[in-house]
Amino acid sequence: MTAGAFSDVVRARLMARSGGFCEVRVPGCWDEASQAHHRRPRGLGGSRSPQTGQASNGLMVCLPCHQHLETVERGEARDRGWIVRQGADPREIPVYRYRQWVLLDDEGGLSPAGVVA
């Protein structure tokens, strides 16, 4: 397995948490999740961090949403916790998911973040 990649166990946790639906949902979303997105990118040294391959660092997304996150709008993605800066702990960064702010854990669970947007 590539350093920082999601294991089959973690991918299963991400899919269970998402229910098979895209967790980002920008305009043009296909709804069905087909890819695992790293909130804290693996580049720039991120793949060496043990947190990179954990469920708190992942979101299940559809292709259009993944392309949006990776190429179009990094500012919005950071503001919504869909992308996390290197050095940050994804477990501590709220993410906007299904119209609410949540914190993700490494077991594939989530809890309300108490963020007022």
Question: What spans do the regions from the language model cover?
Answer:
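Short, charged surface segments at domain edges that flank catalytic/cofactor-binding sites
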Residues: 1-21, 46-56, 94-95
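Terminal targeting/leader modules
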Residues: 3-4, 9, 41, 46-47, ...
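Short cysteine-rich loop/turn motifs with clustered Cys
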Residues: 6-37, 60-65
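Charged/polar, solvent-exposed surface patches and flexible loops
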Residues: 12-16, 75-80
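Short Cys/His-centered divalent metal-binding micro-motifs
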Residues: 27-34, 43, 55-79
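Short microdomains enriched in Cys/His and/or Lys/Arg
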Residues: 43-63, 80-95
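Short flanking/linker segments adjacent to small metal-binding domains or redox-active Cys/His motifs
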Residues: 82-117
